[in-house]
Amino acid sequence: MDSKFSFLLIVLTLTLGSCKTQNVDTSAINLVKNKLPEFSWDKMPLYMHLRKSTSFSNKEIQYLSKFPLITFEKTTGSKTFGSTEKGTIKAAKAVKKINPNAKILYYKNVVINWGGYSEDENFLYEHPEALLINAKGQKSVMPNGKTGFFDISEDYVRKYWLHHVKKVTENPFIDGVFLDANIKVLVPGFFNSRVGEEKQEAIKSGYLSMMADLDSQLGDDNLLIANILRVRPEFEDSGRAYLKFFDGSYIEGFEHESFGMAYEDYLAQGIEAVQKSAREGKVIAMSLGIGKGLKNAEAGIDDVRKKVSKHEDFSKRLEYLLAIFLVCAEKYSYVYPHDGYGTEKSAVWLKTFPQYEKPLGKPLGFAKREGYIYTRKFEHVDVWLDIKNKTSKLNYK
């Protein structure tokens, strides 16, 4: 771990010394030899999760450099630099020039063969049989009808996946991995309907083995964040048992009604799971959609929402989402109220809001709950949240 950060310091010093587009004081660089992100209660602790297939402008990099924790999604930089791997590293390097303490995660799906990864393409060219097939001998696909899956029940496929992730994270500008589609693997319904129960169990077993290997091989030096906590009937305690492999959880699909549960009951159960995990010191990257939730073909797995207009007043909605976050948050909890992750169509990209800049202060205790009403006091704000009526108040002192 020390060697990784030492190398980063050397590279940054040399790079910054020759940088013509950014005016940065290299003497001020102070790399934190800790895989956890920087955290402060001074203001709202924010997370960033995004994708852009072309290169980022200087303005965009300056904006990104303000976030302590960033995930660059699939396709990042792939059109400009030829692959997601190269595009992510280029973007990470640019951010690190300005803020070397920002923690940057490389997105890698645990099973879905998303396009744009050059190493995946090369591997599948040599091993086309590594893709999952159904009982008819046809490629098993996502709801889009074309994107396939890696057959992670096979040992050689898992070894390739681990080698790929290890190679990218060895780059000094990458601090860890964001792991997606865990829930698709763990709940029986998704793969049962595609490849049958026996194969689904083999995929799940392969996944558990792969995550254990990931933790043992990369966990000491790299931040491992998984899209894992979720209220589902198949999970005990909302999937918290799987956090043993990871440093924390990304949160989505958090705030709607599902599986016959009322909105407020589903959300209350999710809040409880996040509170428990955050209090145990797990990193929480809470992603909350500003737009109205839409039904999805894989209900309860993917969070799909209506876009919001750039001219729309969503201040009340934003305050409500921040109140949800604040009744859950502990040290190493971060929030991203968003309008989708693609920068081209997002109404909140490059924007900030007054609630992000107002003083927050340390919490003066855990949140208190009475029925569906939560309250919590911070040094500079009192939070009141009613999840049954979907209302909130942030009373700044």
Annotated model-derived regions:
Residues M1-F5:
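Positively charged n-region of N-terminal signal peptides that target proteins for export
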Residues V24-K397:
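Glycan-processing catalytic domains of CAZymes
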Residues G17-S18:
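C-terminal motif of bacterial Sec signal peptides marking the signal peptidase cleavage site
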Residues S6-L14:
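Sec-dependent N-terminal signal peptides
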